Amino acid sequence: MKTKTSLILTVAALALSGSALAEVKIALVAKSLGNGFFEAANVGAQQAAKELGDVKVIYTGPTTTTAEAQIDVLNGLIAQGVDAIAISANDPDAVVPVLKKAMQRGIKVVSWDSGVAPAGRQIHLNPSNNALIGETNVKLAADALKALNVEKGDVAVLSATPTSTNQ
């Protein structure tokens, strides 16, 4: 997690390296606040910001996992004049218009974890692929059940949001 978050911030900082700004403001936009995965990403982002120096990470996101709520957050960040937005999108297409607006204003846009359609970003950092994640999860679950001598049972699959690109 820390490596991936450091990579995201480094890419965003390098994209802004020609800027004369004293401090680079990078918004780390989660699918939703209060999610342990994104809280861990924030910890890594804050650490990477310290290591890079002159980088301020603004960790934010909606309280609900809807595209509309995320769009509201993005509009606020554009109004604040952040230098870069690193987003894990709730919906890959719905956020494109607001991210295009951000890019038109010179804001660098990176998607990570759950990607944004190419028209709404400059780069996407994919931490893994869905097939590998699914295969690994099933193998780990099967191994754990086998260790407990469980040979039969029901399986439930939980997902974050149906519109996420990584679900």
Label for each model-derived stretch:
Residues 1-8:
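Bacterial N-terminal signal peptides that target proteins for export
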Residues 10-12, 21-167:
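A residue-level marker of the well-folded mature domains of exported/periplasmic proteins
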